[in-house]
Amino acid sequence: MKSGRFIGVMSGTSLDGVDVVLATIDEHRVAQLASLSWPIPVSLKQAVLDICQGQQLTLSQFGQLDTQLGRLFADAVNALLKEQNLQARDIVAIGCHGQAVWHEPTGVAPHTLQIGDNNQIVARTGITVVGDFRRRDIALGGQGAPLVPAFHHALLAHSTERRMVLNIGGIANLSLLIPGQPVGGYDTGPGNMLMDAWIWRQAGKPYDKDAEWARAGKVILPLLQNMLSDPYFSQPAPKSTGREYFNYGWLERHLRHFPGVDPRDVQATLAELTAVTISEQVLLSGGCERLMVCGGGSRNPLLMARLAALLPGTEVTTTDAVGISGDDMEALAFAWLAWRTLAGLPGNLPSVTGASQETVLGAIFPANP
């Protein structure tokens, strides 16, 4: 069974940077050693945003974007190796999620697409890469997402305490770690995505630092109710979503009924949308004693305060409190999934994704010996 140093690479739907994590992994433990966040050039970020919202590309443009993202991920890995004074031979493999650009797990031909050419990463780092983690699960009838609940269960499940892990990235997803029950998990809806998109358009800021804009505004209740009527929120699990659904166009369609509103009030309403849709799903799933939050949203003081207020009797904390950096959780999970793949172990949970069976995930891109 392969064990040793692994690197996880994650570029999420929030597009706030490439997260790279170095960890030692074996069958008994996952020990994080180092991490860094690598910036995404504005031009690349905009290209990804455009394709996620349905802008048409030529095959040439699509191929160039795939190559550029692969090079970006390789640069991020090499920066971490240099910082840690490590060589390619010191790393067993890289687990790279890729950049999600489309996710459509239902319909006549279900599919999901994460780009960033893994061959570029192998060529530029000299390290074996495991990628394309989601499509095997979809081929077996699953949603292909979320995949991180399996990792949350391995690290954070408790024998008697009802726990849930909440990742608030661009999309928010919930892992249900309830003693005596199969692991559950699904996307609750928008996390930071709509909040980030709004303040980017209104103020040219990548995100609402310390929720300053949202805290200066007031929730527009009719707008909130209008957004909460979206059928995704009442759809039963298993379910997953992404930027191709909850994007700026989605927000604009709801705002048409509310002309002339204060931009800060919209920001406050979007924060409340995220908090309400998460808390409703926690309660509908039977509630928990401890909700452990990770991802960029765990740094949003307004979101954390609203979750605590909407979930009385639940201890709302961050995964940092149990020794796992909330900023690095997803990248660490894909390092672990790479280890599972090389060990020939399944990486999905049918109770989460709805797949017909457990399966080894991903494709292996071997480095030269």
Swiss-Prot record:
CDD domains: ASKHA_NBD_ANMK. Transmembrane segments: none annotated. GO terms for molecular function: ATP binding; kinase activity; phosphotransferase activity, alcohol group as acceptor. It catalyses: 1,6-anhydro-N-acetyl-beta-muramate + ATP + H2O = N-acetyl-D-muramate 6-phosphate + ADP + H(+). Pfam families: AnmK (PF03702). Its EC number is 2.7.1.170. Pathway: Amino-sugar metabolism; 1,6-anhydro-N-acetylmuramate degradation; Cell wall biogenesis; peptidoglycan recycling. ATP binds at residues 12-19. The keyword Kinase applies. It comes from the Bacteria. Keywords: ATP-binding, Carbohydrate metabolism, Kinase, Nucleotide-binding, Transferase. One of its GO terms (biological process) is 1,6-anhydro-N-acetyl-beta-muramic acid catabolic process. The keyword NADP does not apply. Catalyzes the specific phosphorylation of 1,6-anhydro-N-acetylmuramic acid (anhMurNAc) with the simultaneous cleavage of the 1,6-anhydro ring, generating MurNAc-6-P. Is required for the utilization of anhMurNAc either imported from the medium or derived from its own cell wall murein, and thus plays a role in cell wall recycling. Belongs to the anhydro-N-acetylmuramic acid kinase family. HAMAP family: AnhMurNAc_kinase. PANTHER family: ANHYDRO-N-ACETYLMURAMIC ACID KINASE (PTHR30605:SF0). This is Anhydro-N-acetylmuramic acid kinase.
